[in-house]
Amino acid sequence: MLPTENRLRRREDFATAVRRGRRAGRPLLVVHLRSGDTDPHVTGETVPPPRAGFVVSKAVGGAVVRTAVKRRLRHLVRDRLAQLPPGSLVVVRALPGAGDADHAQLARDLDAALQRLLGGGAR
């Protein structure tokens, strides 16, 4: 489970990450990253932690499949939070094939997308 301070919850935050962030698409998922954004909801001089949110539509599958995909993605992102810049907003959108994919396939696509967004990969 993602720690509370690393969860993206507000609709405005999802919209900011998707509309103003950079995007990297893979066969199973799309990752939107808004780097180094200051959190308008937190006052003070502390550096906000990276926050992540997930979008899994009904095209992925039924409720049980969608929940399983969300849990897998949460677990994968939790292990990769240290790679993300402080204050960044990440939205991981699962594509229809994600429902049939195993953990390793999702991990491979997530790593490739993050690598591309964080400056390590070519288009």
UniProtKB/Swiss-Prot annotation:
Alphabetized Pfam families for the sequence: Ribonuclease_P
- Alphabetic keyword roster: Endonuclease, Hydrolase, Nuclease, RNA-binding, tRNA processing
Q: Which GO terms describe its cellular component?
A: ribonuclease P complex
Q: What family does the Swiss-Prot or TrEMBL record give for this protein?
A: Belongs to the RnpA family.
Tell me, what does this protein do in biology? RNaseP catalyzes the removal of the 5'-leader sequence from pre-tRNA to produce the mature 5'-terminus. It can also cleave other RNA substrates such as 4.5S RNA. The protein component plays an auxiliary but essential role in vivo by binding to the 5'-leader sequence and broadening the substrate specificity of the ribozyme.
Q: How does it assemble?
A: Consists of a catalytic RNA component (M1 or rnpB) and a protein subunit.
- State what protein this is by name: Ribonuclease P protein component
Native source species: Streptomyces griseus subsp. griseus (strain JCM 4626 / CBS 651.72 / NBRC 13350 / KCC S-0626 / ISP 5235)
* Gene behind this protein: rnpA
